[in-house]
Amino acid sequence: MTEYSETGMIGSGAITTKRLSKEDINALPLAYWQGPVHLIATAEEAAAVAQRCSREQLLGFDTETRPAFHKGQKFIPSLLQLATETEVFLVQVQASGMVGPLRDLLANPAITKAGVAPSFDLHSLQELAPFTPGGFVDLSTMARQ
């Protein structure tokens, strides 16, 4: 059985980039978020979240949007997810709006925001309120390298 740690595979002492088999994946322990999750529904709360997150060096980033099933149909994001090392914020952007402090946070190049294929999410958020994204890292691109 292969042994794992938070930093990668342990064995010969070096981290390997080999593909994991289904058996290896199924042998991994299940993990889930155990920290606080905050639901944000007002502009004031969204501004406070932006202020809180602006003290971080790294944020997790994602959005959730209603799926479209017809050609040409599209919807705006309903949820902006921001995660620090210790807490998660679920911002209901249709209720709170893309307040200035949130736009400033998403534009700040000094704070790394990591997500999977964030360009689509960012384009959708920019339809709610214009801003120039800064500091975003696409984890799917990094995973392919």
Where on the chain are the PLM-derived regions?
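Short, basic/hydrophobic alpha-helical segments
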Residues: 48-49, 97-109
